[in-house]
């Protein structure tokens, strides 16, 4: 181990034998893994992330990652503190799909967005990986209201990640009694989300050109704010045609110069 610190990470990865279960190392190797962990500092961060990704996606991820936490390896590579029988780690095995960022998001649920940024830098995540991590992490702990219009807005803001977000919230609601919502609360929203069958890739019906023609608002921040407001209403009300937008425009008080309170697509 002392010659190749990357073997430390590979040893943990090898413990996960997939369908064959877990191979726990004998005591001599287990002690060596714990005592040589400072050597992980010598390895290129990208290589550590490459190994850690494979561990996170393993069939026995919860058991292996908890062992890494108990052995001090997780603290060494992520510079964050972990609990014994950590709920976040326990939930890794229950997560559907093979998106490794979802697994990081679950692990980092109780840490700050600053911690996530530092971890992204520490593990040298790609720009896309970092963007997905920060976006998803910011949504955790928030539930949309259980109404059709709010759920439509939620779905379009979240894109293809809406259902997975609710599934993750459901897991934490079941295992985290301190939350102010229950597993049933999340399930109701999940049922509504799936029932509505929302097109998350919907585009604004009203272009900037169209709004300028209808309102004589010149190009600038106010035009952008009105376009955002119209798109919000289009999604929330499930409008399908430009005629419906036309009718809507007659009912909105868009003449005021203060656009700070105008709705726009966002969650939370």
Q: Which residues fall in each region the model found?
A:
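A diffuse structural propensity rather than consistent per-protein peaks
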Residues: 25-26, 44, 146-152, 182, ...
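Divalent metal-dependent catalytic cores for phosphoryl transfer on phosphate-bearing substrates
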Residues: 83-182
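Short acidic/polar alpha-helix capping motifs at helix-coil junctions
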Residues: 28-31, 171-177, 193-194
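Short Gly/charged-rich anion-binding patches and loops
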Residues: 63, 115, 132, 206-207
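Charged substrate- and nucleic-acid-binding regions of tRNA-handling and nucleotidyl-transfer enzymes
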Residues: 13, 176-268
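Glycine- and charge-enriched loop/helix tracts that form the active or gating conduit
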Residues: 1-123, 221, 226, 231-234, ...
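Short, mixed-charge aromatic SLiMs
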Residues: 32-45, 92-93, 120-136, 142, ...
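Residue-level detector of short coil/turn "hinge" positions at structural boundaries
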Residues: 24, 75, 127, 144, ...
